[in-house]
Amino acid sequence: MFDVAPSELLLVAVVALVVIGPKDLPRAMRVVGRWLGKARKLSRHFRSGIDEMIRQSEMEDMEKRWAEENAKLLAENQGQGNQTASTSSPATPSPVSDDPAEQNIVFTSPADLEVNTADTSHLAANHTETTATTAASTPAKPKEADQQEKQS
């Protein structure tokens, strides 16, 4: 639709040379270049605005899905907890609300979950100290004994 062939560009250049003249042609080309640059900048800005709106919409959809999944998991976990409690004592289960604000659920975005690898070196040392302390203070289970042998 907006295809510009080389022959059309040559025709426009010849007409511009004849109409504007060789003396003012460089200045005219600079003005045209500035206007084209402004048009490209405006187009890029407009396109980035649309991309940002699409990204925000997708993030809202993902947050809604996360809220639904968290509510389902919470309901399942509370249902399992109520089943074990009902076998030991007859108690009425509390109603589960679908409102995440009432459930005190904290949602995190994928950006909050990023880990800076440069800052994790001290975490590895703390982790080994913690596991050694925990392993010494708790009795070893057969699975843990096998895992400790594999690590050594």
From Swiss-Prot:
<keyword id="KW-0653">Protein transport</keyword>
<keyword id="KW-0813">Transport</keyword>
<keyword id="KW-1003">Cell membrane</keyword>
<feature type="compositionally biased region" description="Basic and acidic residues">
    <location>
        <begin position="60"/>
        <end position="71"/>
    </location>
</feature>
<dbReference type="GO" id="GO:0033281">
    <property type="term" value="C:TAT protein transport complex"/>
</dbReference>
<protein>
    <recommendedName>
        <fullName>Sec-independent protein translocase protein TatB</fullName>
    </recommendedName>
</protein>
<keyword id="KW-1133">Transmembrane helix</keyword>
<comment type="similarity">
    <text>Belongs to the TatB family.</text>
</comment>
<comment type="function">
    <text>Part of the twin-arginine translocation (Tat) system that transports large folded proteins containing a characteristic twin-arginine motif in their signal peptide across membranes. Together with TatC, TatB is part of a receptor directly interacting with Tat signal peptides. TatB may form an oligomeric binding site that transiently accommodates folded Tat precursor proteins before their translocation.</text>
</comment>
<keyword id="KW-0811">Translocation</keyword>
<dbReference type="InterPro" id="IPR003369">
    <property type="entry name" value="TatA/B/E"/>
</dbReference>
<keyword id="KW-0812">Transmembrane</keyword>
<feature type="compositionally biased region" description="Low complexity">
    <location>
        <begin position="124"/>
        <end position="140"/>
    </location>
</feature>
<feature type="transmembrane region" description="Helical">
    <location>
        <begin position="1"/>
        <end position="21"/>
    </location>
</feature>
<comment type="subunit">
    <text>The Tat system comprises two distinct complexes: a TatABC complex, containing multiple copies of TatA, TatB and TatC subunits, and a separate TatA complex, containing only TatA subunits. Substrates initially bind to the TatABC complex, which probably triggers association of the separate TatA complex to form the active translocon.</text>
</comment>
<dbReference type="Pfam" id="PF02416">
    <property type="entry name" value="TatA_B_E"/>
</dbReference>
<feature type="compositionally biased region" description="Low complexity">
    <location>
        <begin position="84"/>
        <end position="98"/>
    </location>
</feature>
<feature type="region of interest" description="Disordered">
    <location>
        <begin position="60"/>
        <end position="152"/>
    </location>
</feature>
<feature type="compositionally biased region" description="Basic and acidic residues">
    <location>
        <begin position="141"/>
        <end position="152"/>
    </location>
</feature>
<keyword id="KW-0997">Cell inner membrane</keyword>
<dbReference type="GO" id="GO:0008320">
    <property type="term" value="F:protein transmembrane transporter activity"/>
</dbReference>
<dbReference type="GO" id="GO:0043953">
    <property type="term" value="P:protein transport by the Tat complex"/>
</dbReference>
<dbReference type="InterPro" id="IPR018448">
    <property type="entry name" value="TatB"/>
</dbReference>
<keyword id="KW-0472">Membrane</keyword>
